[in-house]
């Protein structure tokens, strides 16, 4: 009985032990489930993967065997850790016990490691574009739409943004891409190194040490750029100042983005003996400037597509606190122009290609010529709404810029024009209501007459300050003259039609007789334009006057070429016969040609052909304007010329459009530049302003009489025509006299 009871107690004790063990197992399983559920809810963006499906590039090997999370844990601690055997199979001999496992089994009955991988979220993996990066560095920037060019099916947008005082313009097929391009150009202007490797390489550190960024260390001097040592190497740069390292480190610890100017060059002056023209040779201006001011950065301000496959770049560089710009068909050419402008302005250095010699003493400084060209083209772009207007089409663009001396800071565009046509003979007017010649250079000169009349009319104003604003001052002997240092510069986008354009693409030798060019027979000859067409032909026959009835019956209306007319302005002046009653002759200081030019030949046809003119009266001279091309020559524009001419005068809001075939405005009215309008303005001035002509008497009744009243002007004009004939260059062809036989009207 006792044995039975003992065995019963023994069996009861065993069953109670098994029950306790099972309770403990259930308790451990429930705790393990709770841990897994807590982890799954906390790590929602994570997912579980088996070893066969993991991506080693994207996963983070984590272990959930321990509840502790330690900072700066070694990577080796995060490897696979199997559960202890006692935890999953106590004794290992109870196969009858079925348990649910929270994890999959594998690898011989061991639990697989729990692998957690961050989901590839778009916001976390997509790199920041230029717009976002620029906004983070410079918040609050304003992007503005500059222009929209191109056809409707393939538009080209231009968007600009101003950063650090510089305007960056980007172009693209959409506004978004143009905006992105502008942001990229702005970032390149002040972000020197896009990644750390380039920064260390540039600063002299080929490798960067491995750094634990999870440690508690605040600064990592070994991973930053090398600090500039206090200079004991000041032999090369005697004006150097050491960098304030304490200031840099303290600013870094405060976490500020720092702009600190390193005075590496001081007030160093160039070694002129080392940079003499003979030593410079054919060196690039960018290289020369870099020797004087090392470490300069060139910034691309704009990149515009003027035409298909034709781009224009504007580069800028800041030297000694001054900004210099250059433009060109490539960034390399634009950088060269900016560097040349800086060399000339700061160091008075001209490279051999820019140094005027004895044979080139009549050349205009290249940087000044480029500035005038840019002023004219930018003004035309502004008036045509970024070249989007239908009237932006042109084959030739001309403009006159007024300066005080050669200071481009005070330069002002006063007139603009475009056009390449002349009127048809059937539209000729005997009342002075049409503009006969609508070529850009000629229209620019007529617009300049409009400007001169406006300046003279200021002397009729009742306000005392108005005469002071005029470019004219009164002369004691009578009449008016230009104020001191007022200069006018003519810009033409292509060589003027006539002899200047005929020979411009070719090199002209010093000995003209040795030239083998096919047109040497007519070189320097007077030429006339083709009616309602383009191009010129040499003057034919000795007849100098056209007849009114012959033109009406079908004879071609002959107009002298632009080259010959500009040559006459260098003797007679720009003001014409009527204004000679009031002012002294006004001459051009320079002529700038955008393309198809040869400076030597241009000087010969503009000035040298009139060397035999003889002695001229007082206030008249044989003017020799300074000549220059531009660095950024305009590309050839194939296609037909537009049948209109546009003109603008300072003070006017919009362009005036003239039909080049009829010589009148597109609406049918007379242009502000026609003879009839000018004669009325002249009549209002006559008798109220002091004149240069003694005993001028009453106002003439006819336009032709007013022109003949300028006796000195007419005599110089005849003297010029005889000089052309004497040189064997042909006879100047005049319009029918009936054109000027109309009454003056007030």
UniProtKB/Swiss-Prot annotation:
Compartments where found: Nucleus
Domain DRBM: 126-192, 284-348
SMART domains: ADEAMc (SM00552), DSRM (SM00358)
Entry's EC annotation: 3.5.-.-
PROSITE patterns found in the cross-reference section: A_DEAMIN_EDITASE, DS_RBD
Main localization, broad class: nucleus
Active site residues according to the UniProt entry: 441 (proton donor)
Annotated keywords: Hydrolase, Metal-binding, mRNA processing, Nucleus, Repeat, RNA-binding, Zinc
Tissue: Brain specific.
Residues that bind Zn(2+): 439, 497, 562
InterPro entries attached to this UniProt entry: A_deamin, ADAR3_DSRM_1, dsRBD_dom
Compositional bias (Basic residues): 20-34
GO cellular component terms, semicolon-separated: cytoplasm; nucleolus
Annotated segments matching region Disordered: 1-36, 50-105
An annotated GO BP: RNA processing
Region (R-domain (ssRNA-binding)): 23-35
Recorded GO MF terms: double-stranded RNA adenosine deaminase activity; double-stranded RNA binding; metal ion binding; tRNA-specific adenosine deaminase activity
Residues annotated as domain A to I editase: 415-742
Functional description taken from the UniProt entry: Lacks editing activity. It prevents the binding of other ADAR enzymes to targets in vitro, and decreases the efficiency of these enzymes. Capable of binding to dsRNA but also to ssRNA.
Name recorded for this polypeptide: Double-stranded RNA-specific editase B2
Encoding gene, per UniProt annotation: Adarb2
